[in-house]
């Protein structure tokens, strides 16, 4: 069985990296990555930059992306522009994209990675909490995609990769908000692939499973003993890591996937096929994690 590539737990760059793809796969391309200051988004930025790409990393937290950009540029030697931006605010997106275009003159790739999630029973979920997740995950993905379409992709082509999830595939307990939001994004992926394909724009989704070293796993994974049992029951019997997800996104964003559009690539080790969907167990963990 293939061994996973090395990874580190926190938001730090890899101490060493062995290229599985050509090192200049994205040479001098520019990628705009929402949620790029931490977690999976941070690792996507790093792996892209290690393949010759310059990046723009956008997040609501300017200190976070400033710190991330210094780490990324130092480790890879490529340029990284940190920007403060809320995906729910179209004027802020327009300003950020304008600044990125002024800095680089082009944007070739958009990675929609900004997201919000937590465990909550549907009957206890506030109207505002549901709306907030939909606004960030679904509306935010559309907002950034539409602005980049108008500002650059319509006339120059481009690639969009939306980071989604498998929650909606089976109706995951305590995840009606995130599952609905991400399922809507997968539908959006197909709609935009059809409408924007003639402008040489490819649009795909990447749906990760449980990934080590992420805030999502801490919030959603459950107690360690319970998580270990779930992982052992999954087909590959291990968690994924951020580098593996970044490699999958790299494939979709690169010329290797030049004839792939409107697709959802699931990168979860088969976990969605076997992970338990235990409402009571998840509810107990949600109650516990809310106190952390």
Swiss-Prot record:
Cited Pfam families: adh_short_C2
Keyword Disulfide bond: no
Cellular localisation: Peroxisome
Binding site for NADP(+): 35-40, 60-64, 86, 182, 208-214
Alphabetical list of SUPFAM superfamilies matching this protein: NAD(P)-binding Rossmann-fold domains
Cellular compartments per GO CC: peroxisome
List of residues that carry N6-acetyllysine: 151, 291
Reactions the enzyme catalyzes: a (2E,4Z)-dienoyl-CoA + NADPH + H(+) = a 4,5-saturated-(3E)-enoyl-CoA + NADP(+); a (2E,4E)-dienoyl-CoA + NADPH + H(+) = a 4,5-saturated-(3E)-enoyl-CoA + NADP(+); (2E,4E)-hexadienoyl-CoA + NADPH + H(+) = (3E)-hexenoyl-CoA + NADP(+); (2E,4E)-decadienoyl-CoA + NADPH + H(+) = (3E)-decenoyl-CoA + NADP(+)
Cited InterPro entries: DECR2-like, NAD(P)-bd_dom_sf, SDR_fam
EC nos: 1.3.1.124
Family of this protein: Belongs to the short-chain dehydrogenases/reductases (SDR) family. 2,4-dienoyl-CoA reductase subfamily.
PANTHER family cross-referenced by the UniProt entry: PEROXISOMAL 2,4-DIENOYL-COA REDUCTASE (PTHR43296), PEROXISOMAL 2,4-DIENOYL-COA REDUCTASE [(3E)-ENOYL-COA-PRODUCING] (PTHR43296:SF2)
Function: Auxiliary enzyme of beta-oxidation. Participates in the degradation of unsaturated fatty enoyl-CoA esters having double bonds in both even- and odd-numbered positions in peroxisome. Catalyzes the NADP-dependent reduction of 2,4-dienoyl-CoA to yield trans-3-enoyl-CoA. Has activity towards short and medium chain 2,4-dienoyl-CoAs, but also towards 2,4,7,10,13,16,19-docosaheptaenoyl-CoA, suggesting that it does not constitute a rate limiting step in the peroxisomal degradation of docosahexaenoic acid.
Name of the molecule in the record: Peroxisomal 2,4-dienoyl-CoA reductase [(3E)-enoyl-CoA-producing]
Organism in which the protein naturally occurs: Pongo abelii
């Amino acid at each position: 069985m293939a061994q996973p590539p090395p990874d580190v737990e926190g938001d730090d760059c890899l101490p060493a990296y062995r290229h599985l793809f050509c090192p200049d796969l994205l040479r001098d391309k520019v990628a705009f990555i929402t949620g790029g200051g931490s977690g999976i988004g941070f690792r996507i930025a790093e792996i892209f930059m290690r393949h010759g790409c310059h990046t723009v990393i956008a997040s609501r937290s300017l200190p976070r992306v400033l710190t991330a950009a210094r780490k990324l540029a130092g480790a890879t030697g490529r340029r990284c522009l940190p920007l403060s931006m809320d995906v729910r605010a179209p004027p802020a997106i327009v300003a950020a994209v304008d600044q990125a275009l002024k800095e680089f003159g082009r944007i070739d790739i958009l990675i929609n990675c900004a997201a919000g999630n937590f465990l909550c029973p549907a009957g206890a979920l506030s109207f505002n909490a549901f709306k907030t997740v939909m606004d960030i995950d679904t509306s935010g993905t559309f907002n950034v995609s539409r602005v980049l379409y108008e500002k650059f992709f319509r006339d120059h082509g481009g690639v969009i990769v939306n980071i989604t999830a498998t929650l909606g595939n089976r109706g995951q307990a305590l995840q009606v908000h995130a599952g609905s939001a991400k399922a809507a994004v997968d539908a959006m992926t197909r709609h935009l692939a059809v409408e924007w394909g003639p402008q040489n724009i490819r649009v795909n989704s990447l749906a990760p499973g449980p990934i080590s070293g992420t805030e999502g796993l801490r919030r959603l994974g459950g107690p360690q003993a319970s998580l270990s049992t779930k992982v052992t029951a999954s087909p590959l019997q291990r968690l994924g890591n951020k580098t593996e997800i970044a490699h999958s996104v790299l494939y979709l964003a690169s010329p290797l996937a030049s004839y792939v559009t409107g697709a959802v690539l699931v990168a979860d080790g088969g976990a969605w096929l076997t992970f338990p969907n235990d409402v009571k167990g998840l509810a107990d963990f949600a109650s516990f994690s809310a106190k952390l």
